[in-house]
Amino acid sequence: MKRPLRRPFAVLLFVVLCAAASFPSVLRRSVGPAPVLAPLPPLDPARLNATLLRLAAADPSEAPLRRDVDDLLEGRLPASSARARAWRLRGDRLHLHLRHHQFPVYRRGHHPDHDHDPLLHPLPRQELHLDPSLRRALRSWHRLRRHDPGVLRNLPSLLSLPGRIPSCAVVGNSGILLGASHGALIDSHAAVFRLNNARISGFAANVGAKTNLSFINSNVLHLCARRPNCFCHPYGDGVPILLYICQAAHFLDVASCNASSRSLHAASISVTDPRLDVLCARIVKYYSLRRFVAETGRAAEEWSSTRDAAMFHYSSGMQAIMVAVGVCDRVSVFGFGKAADAKHHYHSNQKAELDLHDYKAEYAFYRDLADRPEVVPFLNDAGIAVPPVVFYH
């Protein structure tokens, strides 16, 4: 009875042994490396450039800015600012200097307790009362916020200058200035631009002592204006201040500073032409988009997924250089850039850069501006001959 079972059993054993012998080769084929795929063909440069230009022209901050301006025009503190900020307006009647006119601002009530940070006590939105002339000025400012590269050509007259300045030094705040001994060279220029109220006392040998224009962003002014004893002209009464607006509600800080008793005889604070703001924003965004595509290999449309596109902004230094390009016959730039052994700012202990700026993209723009300005997008439509620009390190 056992004999008939031997042959089927032998066949089954043979099949099992064959399967076991072939399993390693099957396994190697199943888990082996995937076939190498051919790389994607590079995007046509002209097509890529057109995409970058199109995306750089998009402004996701326009809608919220429009809402903030509407709030101010209707006498309300903008919702984007009311939650965490307040403006300590000095007195019941203030003046905002804008476009060479004075515009009164009225309000009811005040903050009698100066021991408390006014940022913790926002003004009730219904208490802000703007003069009709101020409403017209704000409306005009927002209406001018459009792309017009020709604004560079008109900067001397917009800034009430008698003509172009022979030579300008734009002094940044990088720690690379320490030990550079550029002070005398900086002061030898016809005009010296400084950024964001950077301190010069004690640093004159490296950063110079002369100041002809103070260029600041409105966040810096806001931090000063919220303090009861703020003096908005740290370089002296005779040094004009040119300010670009980061939030529409910061116009109230301009009013506060211009109306303070210590500023009555000082040079007024001027606001940058919004067309210049738009031009600077487009240039920097273009270079940021280009850097993103080159470094990641991803589509330019994905740039906004890595940044807060509505908050993305150029730096104060970048716009100061653009102003110099528009009003100076020769531009020298100091204190821009980084070094491993240098502080972020020569005058402070700030450790890191702000995320809303793309400094590497701005450095790429500076290289093109100095070496081949004809390739800078949007700038080549300004209708001006870009003056020589030299960066000192």
From Swiss-Prot:
Stretches assigned to the Cytoplasmic side: 1-8
GO cellular component: Golgi membrane
Biological processes per GO annotation: protein glycosylation
Function recorded in the entry: Possesses sialyltransferase-like activity in vitro. Transfers sialic acid to the oligosaccharide Gal-beta-1,3-GalNAc and to glycoproteins such as asialofetuin, alpha-1-acid glycoprotein (NeuAc-alpha-2,3-Gal-beta-1,3-GalNAc-) and andasialo-alpha-1-acid glycoprotein. The transferred sialic acid is linked to galactose of Gal-beta-1,3-GalNAc through alpha-2,6-linkage.
E.C. code: 2.4.99.-
Glycosylation (residues): N49, N212, N258
Residues annotated as transmembrane: 9-27
Tissues where this protein is expressed: Expressed in leaves and stalks. Expressed at low levels in roots.
Superkingdom classification of source: Eukaryota
All ranges on the Lumenal side of the membrane: 28-393
Record-linked InterPro entries: Glyco_trans_29, GT29-like_sf
Gene name of the record: STLP1
Compartmental location: Golgi apparatus membrane
Family label: Belongs to the glycosyltransferase 29 family.
Species of origin: Oryza sativa subsp. japonica (Rice)
One Gene Ontology MF term: sialyltransferase activity
UniProt-recorded name of the protein: Sialyltransferase-like protein 1
Keywords, comma-separated and alphabetical: Glycoprotein, Glycosyltransferase, Golgi apparatus, Membrane, Signal-anchor, Transferase, Transmembrane, Transmembrane helix
Bilayer topology term: Single-pass type II membrane protein
